[in-house]
Amino acid sequence: MVAKIQADEISSIIKERIDNFELSVDINETGKIVSYADGVAQVYGLSNVMAGEMVEFEEGTRGLVMNLEESTVGVVILGPGPLLKEGMSVKRLGRLLRVPVGDALLGRVVNALGEPIDGKGPIETTETRFVEEKAPGIMARKSVHEPLATGIKAIDALVPIGRGQRELIIGDRQTGKTTVALDAIINQKGNGVVCIYVAVGQKESTVAQIIRRLEDHGAMEYTIVVSSTAAEAAALQFLAPYTGVTMGEYFRDNARHGLIVYDDLSKHAVAYREMSLILRRPPGREAYPGDVFYIHSRLLERAAKVSDERGAGSLTALPIIETQAGDVSAYIPTNVISITDGQIFLETELFNSGVRPAINVGLSVSRVGGAAQIKATKQVAGTLRLDLAQYRELQAFAQFASDLDETSRKQLERGQRMVEVLKQPPFSPLSVEKQVLIIFAGNEGFFDDMAPSNVVRFEAELYPFIEASYPQIFENIRSTSKVDDNTNALMKKALEEFKASFIVA
């Protein structure tokens, strides 16, 4: 039996379908490559594109819109672009650049786009953030008041760093700038500070060596490495520091503490200059574009100590700048010096003469770190900077003067020994209480009758002796963060006892 088709049923179904019909049209603006050279494409037809928007070329390469011109837009290529050529289509992605953030990144090595490059599989994180974020405003900040110990005697005593500070590490090539920064990262073990190391324009072998060094000291478990090597496009080298700081801001905004190292911003400025000149932006001093100050200030202002209302988290920045023949008055060094809260100046002459870390105490300064320094360090290192400055002056004078009075000679000898006290091998950070003890020993004249060559050995043998015989000294300094009369007397007693048993070579 054939079923009868009811006309009214058919009409009601058709009406229902018409009522529920949705016309969804995917409108996608596309353009064409007019010219392509040196990692920059001029694209025609993207009239509604935003500055900083992501675009995609027909063979899959992504780009970032940097220039908005009258008829074309300048797009920098994010990755290798050998297959790009004139006439290829380009489509808008309608979004700004975002990178993954979160705890899943700890222990990983990523590129400037936040993609893993360490062969350990994908990063399991769902949260992403815009690479370009506004820095916290004045009311969202709090003054720097908590110490960030680097474990380096010369820094913690003379140029202390606080959480939320920006402290520049500046010096010629091969003066130990990266070593100082890595020491600071290694010393954060067990302190709850997340570290981010951003390598800009470095050799791949150098980055691999740094990662191995961090792994050897157990520091990779709380560190993220963002690497954009010299072989990569200038656009990726330019983006890497912003990617790193975006990852650091996640911890800062979640009431945690972060430390970020930019190694180095000289190469970052060179990458930006290369990109800007190809985009035909007008060059200024040293051929850098006019906004080269702004690219560094907007980056470094994102490191901050945030207010209690926002969770009291912090992000501390250690930017590195490489100088040429010690010239700190060049364009980029003066820019970054004026942005940061102080600088640690490393000198080739000191490095070559065996003073390592090669910190020039006279030129190094921490503008806000003094408020964060613990009382115990302040007590023992209060006059150390002045004493060392007077020693340097006297040392220069002693080269020409044949005979010195007794006071000057003693000051010169004390200065020599204090320089020895501040020497420290790389990748061996010291706890605050050990620093306080050894500087106290120098100030109290325990090395005055000892050859300077014995000071380092004296220090190495002193710590195990104190831990075994006088552990309460370290306990007192750790618990009270100051040197009271009782601790002072105990330190003198312990040092006298140890010195009596110390065999001078």
Swiss-Prot record:
Catalytic activity: ATP + H2O + 4 H(+)(in) = ADP + phosphate + 5 H(+)(out)
InterPro entries: ATP_synth_asu-like_sf, ATP_synth_asu_C, ATP_synth_asu_C_sf, ATP_synth_F1_a_nt-bd_dom, ATP_synth_F1_asu, ATPase_a/bsu_AS, ATPase_F1/V1/A1_a/bsu_N, ATPase_F1/V1/A1_a/bsu_N_sf
Record keywords, A-Z: ATP synthesis, ATP-binding, Cell inner membrane, Cell membrane, CF(1), Hydrogen ion transport, Ion transport, Membrane, Nucleotide-binding, Translocase, Transport
Gene Ontology molecular-function annotations: ADP binding; ATP binding; proton-transporting ATP synthase activity, rotational mechanism
Cellular component aspect of the GO annotation: plasma membrane; proton-transporting ATP synthase complex
Localization (cell): Cell inner membrane
Annotated site residues (Required for activity) in this chain: S364
EC number per UniProt: 7.1.2.2
Binding sites annotated in the UniProt record for ATP: G171, D172, R173, Q174, T175, G176, K177, T178
Domain of life: Bacteria
SUPFAM superfamilies: C-terminal domain of alpha and beta subunits of F1 ATP synthase (SSF47917), N-terminal domain of alpha and beta subunits of F1 ATP synthase (SSF50615), P-loop containing nucleoside triphosphate hydrolases (SSF52540)
Membrane topology, from the record: Peripheral membrane protein
Function noted in UniProt: Produces ATP from ADP in the presence of a proton gradient across the membrane. The alpha chain is a regulatory subunit.
Subunit structure: F-type ATPases have 2 components, CF(1) - the catalytic core - and CF(0) - the membrane proton channel. CF(1) has five subunits: alpha(3), beta(3), gamma(1), delta(1), epsilon(1). CF(0) has three main subunits: a(1), b(2) and c(9-12). The alpha and beta chains form an alternating ring which encloses part of the gamma chain. CF(1) is attached to CF(0) by a central stalk formed by the gamma and epsilon chains, while a peripheral stalk is formed by the delta and b chains.
Family in the record: Belongs to the ATPase alpha/beta chains family.
Name the UniProt record assigns to this protein: ATP synthase subunit alpha
Source organism of this protein record: Sulfurimonas denitrificans (strain ATCC 33889 / DSM 1251) (Thiomicrospira denitrificans (strain ATCC 33889 / DSM 1251))
Gene name of the encoded protein: atpA
